[in-house]
């Protein structure tokens, strides 16, 4: 399943990020890509050795960790270190699949269950640059407002179409979920959404408490901690 997570960053935060990223040191995006991806990747990434990168990636981690909808959809166990990329002048990233595991500075290794893109450029400011994801439900083309994030299974083939006008800047990361299975995670997310909707409409009740108990028992049964 694919999820749109709105408002991860405020407009003010997005403007500040863009201003700072204009001063960033950018390097060839293939430095973080395996052999297969390097054949189809043509973009730039912020140099991860810079002090600016360290500050901005911490802000992204704080923002997603504080976003309730992100937590409900991803049920994150481990977040990768966020990276930042830039596409311009017909740069693109052809169809590829993300690696199943990635190194992690604290945990050694992490499994990539979900991929996330946090858009930092207004969609009207550039042409092209759609994130195209192929999954069991078909093909999805994604171009979200700045500050919004999209979550999708890392097992999906995906690409970024050429940016033919303007500049597309984004942050991206991977998530190891407490729930490895996409279908189980989607069921928990739907159940959680319905519980929250019922609580806001009717207040607390024995029936809602029973559903909440069911949610946590399923999470307890399926989670890998």
From Swiss-Prot:
<dbReference type="InterPro" id="IPR006620">
    <property type="entry name" value="Pro_4_hyd_alph"/>
</dbReference>
<dbReference type="InterPro" id="IPR005123">
    <property type="entry name" value="Oxoglu/Fe-dep_dioxygenase_dom"/>
</dbReference>
<dbReference type="InterPro" id="IPR044862">
    <property type="entry name" value="Pro_4_hyd_alph_FE2OG_OXY"/>
</dbReference>
<dbReference type="InterPro" id="IPR023550">
    <property type="entry name" value="PKHD_hydroxylase"/>
</dbReference>
<dbReference type="GO" id="GO:0005506">
    <property type="term" value="F:iron ion binding"/>
</dbReference>
<dbReference type="GO" id="GO:0006879">
    <property type="term" value="P:intracellular iron ion homeostasis"/>
</dbReference>
<keyword id="KW-0479">Metal-binding</keyword>
<dbReference type="GO" id="GO:0031418">
    <property type="term" value="F:L-ascorbic acid binding"/>
</dbReference>
<dbReference type="GO" id="GO:0016706">
    <property type="term" value="F:2-oxoglutarate-dependent dioxygenase activity"/>
</dbReference>
<protein>
    <recommendedName>
        <fullName>PKHD-type hydroxylase YbiX</fullName>
        <ecNumber>1.14.11.-</ecNumber>
    </recommendedName>
</protein>
<feature type="binding site">
    <location>
        <position position="96"/>
    </location>
    <ligand>
        <name>Fe cation</name>
    </ligand>
</feature>
<dbReference type="GO" id="GO:0006974">
    <property type="term" value="P:DNA damage response"/>
</dbReference>
<keyword id="KW-0847">Vitamin C</keyword>
<keyword id="KW-0408">Iron</keyword>
<dbReference type="Pfam" id="PF18331">
    <property type="entry name" value="PKHD_C"/>
</dbReference>
<feature type="binding site">
    <location>
        <position position="98"/>
    </location>
    <ligand>
        <name>Fe cation</name>
    </ligand>
</feature>
<dbReference type="Pfam" id="PF13640">
    <property type="entry name" value="2OG-FeII_Oxy_3"/>
</dbReference>
<feature type="domain" description="Fe2OG dioxygenase">
    <location>
        <begin position="78"/>
        <end position="177"/>
    </location>
</feature>
<feature type="binding site">
    <location>
        <position position="158"/>
    </location>
    <ligand>
        <name>Fe cation</name>
    </ligand>
</feature>
<feature type="binding site">
    <location>
        <position position="168"/>
    </location>
    <ligand>
        <name>2-oxoglutarate</name>
    </ligand>
</feature>
<dbReference type="InterPro" id="IPR041097">
    <property type="entry name" value="PKHD_C"/>
</dbReference>
<keyword id="KW-0223">Dioxygenase</keyword>
<keyword id="KW-0560">Oxidoreductase</keyword>
């Amino acid at each position: 399943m694919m999820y749109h997570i709105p408002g991860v960053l405020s407009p003010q935060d997005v403007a500040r990020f863009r201003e700072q990223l204009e001063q960033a040191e950018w390097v060839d995006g293939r430095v973080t890509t395996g052999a297969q991806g390097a054949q189809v990747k043509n973009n730039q990434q912020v140099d991860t050795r810079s002090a600016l990168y360290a500050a901005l990636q911490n802000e992204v981690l704080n923002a997603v960790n504080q976003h309730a909808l992100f937590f409900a959809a991803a049920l994150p166990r481990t977040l990768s270190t966020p990276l930042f990329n830039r596409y311009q002048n017909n740069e693109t990233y052809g169809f590829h699949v993300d690696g199943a595991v990635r190194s992690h500075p604290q945990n050694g290794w992490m499994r990539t269950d979900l991929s996330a893109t946090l858009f930092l450029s207004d969609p009207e400011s550039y042409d092209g640059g759609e994130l195209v994801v192929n999954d069991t439900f078909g093909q999805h083309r994604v171009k979200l407002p700045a500050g919004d994030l999209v979550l999708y299974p890392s097992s999906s083939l995906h690409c970024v179409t050429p940016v033919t006008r303007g500049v597309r800047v984004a942050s991206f990361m991977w998530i190891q979920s407490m729930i490895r299975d996409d279908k189980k995670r989607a069921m928990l997310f739907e159940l959680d959404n319905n519980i929250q909707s019922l609580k806001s409409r009717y207040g607390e009740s024995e029936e809602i408490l029973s559903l909440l108990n069911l949610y946590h028992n399923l999470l307890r049964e399926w989670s890998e901690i």
